């Protein structure tokens, strides 16, 4: 694909401006409902906000049948949300993203619930329970949302309690023994207060057999709930409080190995993709809770004073058979927990002035703890040390090695006994303070100038112990002055950043705006609290890293045409990242790997997004979106295999093109007092690389002939559909649904694990089922 540029938008803008002249007048009296968002922390029409935004409302959530945040990414241009395990959820926007692999490394996309930051990767994949809409903001959002939104932000807006007694019950059943039961009740307490409670319980069997244990991996077992309270305390003071929780516990699949543990040869125990042979079932357990208190006070001068207090806690436990084999060679057990307190104050001006503005103060504190073990299994000596010693690939440090017992060899080369651990323990305490301003000045009837800035300061204090004494030939380091007697690393760092933003909007007519926007953002620096090679740790390489920054430029159009029956939004962008933080598994040779985080690169992303919704008739709507992307390392010396120059390579997880196309058709059935609904969606993402090397195949770590397919995920197209019958009084609905109807079976992800194993993550197969809904 040739590099997209702002000129692409120019032709599109010209065509759209001409569209009203060519459109025939329509007097049918039906239009697409106006979309309202709070992307700038005040209620505005979507077309008036000079930011590239996608909105997924409650109807779209219900009709597509998506249940988790990660499912939304398929429908939104230039957005990827990982579908692997929830412990390391990754959101990528415009080619830029990162999972918070350890507690010292933050993500690049902020995920919020009603404006409150949910936290790091284990908390990201929220259930879409009782939501009004999902807003996806593309591009840096540093002015209003602050740190770690260099790629964008996602805000889940919940449906607030209202003054009517009503509720909803639904039951969903499908193949793979899928079952979901949901309930919602909204209860008026008096004329000034109301409450709501929503609950969802989801279960689904796995679809990847583990032939050693007899279990099926990649199952779902999730309980989600949300309680909300709204009080009109006085005519001027409104109180909104909420509590939400999510508990999940299931057998997961990190990857289906296509090589042995060290990538010396192909996988022998279960070579068929989609079947594994592990000695135990990997597991992912999450307990995520959040509380919010929102106080809104309408002042006599027309201003609004707002206080938003949030507290969120996440406990995540993750285990994996890291040898990917039916015997107990080595395994991992990770436990991370996060406690987050945030407080925000906002002063918001009236909406009808020439100058509208908002002042804000923000405080954020996160206490993160980690407890991670690599455990040498009971079969480690017999099935790892022994075979390598017998083949001559392990040589004890003796002048003329005699034939030694395997356990002696293991001890001589530095491994601990079976059951011993290589571990890291620690905590990171983050304190962040910010003050911000955002305003819009109406220059004339057609021109508006937007401007804002945020000043942030953030400190991180780390107390961390890495003990690699039992790691043998893998040479994991140990913290402290004496690696033979590890002691904690105690350190701190502070980042400060000024993030300005400016925009200019021109109203072409009453229904069409074009805008240009500049915005800056930053991702905070931190500490790489991971398994670092001993030599690199001693040299202080890849341990502490600096903040990264971004400057972004965007040109867009948002308009309504054909008398309000066609909405079209376009955006083109270019963003330049400096000191880009790269998190890599680095192969050091000889079976040694190090996990590095460095400010190693300069990155440029360019592209465009287009979204359209057309109300063809009163009963028929078409929707489409397109994303074009070119995300490359402008400069990344030493970023490839064996220190090769990765400059000019594409970023991982950045497909050149993504699109979605769908239609919704209603058929009235007056005799039944009901209506048929038919919805079909097609989603597509191009192939993309998974490493900075941009490889498509790699050699074995031995003389084994041939290569291993690794480094690129194939393009993927899915077809989803729903056929429903719903009563005209909205009392009941019965629907049949199907997802991935063509049974697309190409792997959806891949990885190279710490010891060298290359593994693929099989796609979710075709799923289908029936949903029953009762509203009261």
Tell me what each language-model feature is.
Residues 357-358, 445-449, 571-576, 598-693, ...:
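Gram-negative outer-membrane beta-barrel transporters
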Residues 23, 332, 336-347, 393, ...:
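Outer membrane beta-barrel strand-and-loop segments of large Gram-negative receptors
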Residues 192, 214, 219-358, 364-370, ...:
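Outer-membrane beta-barrel domain signature, strongest for Gram-negative TonB-dependent receptors
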Residues 208-216, 253-277, 321-331, 373-423, ...:
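Solvent-exposed loop segments that connect transmembrane elements
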Residues 106-108, 120, 127-138, 143-210, ...:
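Outer-membrane beta-barrel translocator/receptor signature
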Residues 290-300, 304-322, 507, 513-519, ...:
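Membrane-embedded beta-barrel scaffold of Gram-negative outer-membrane proteins
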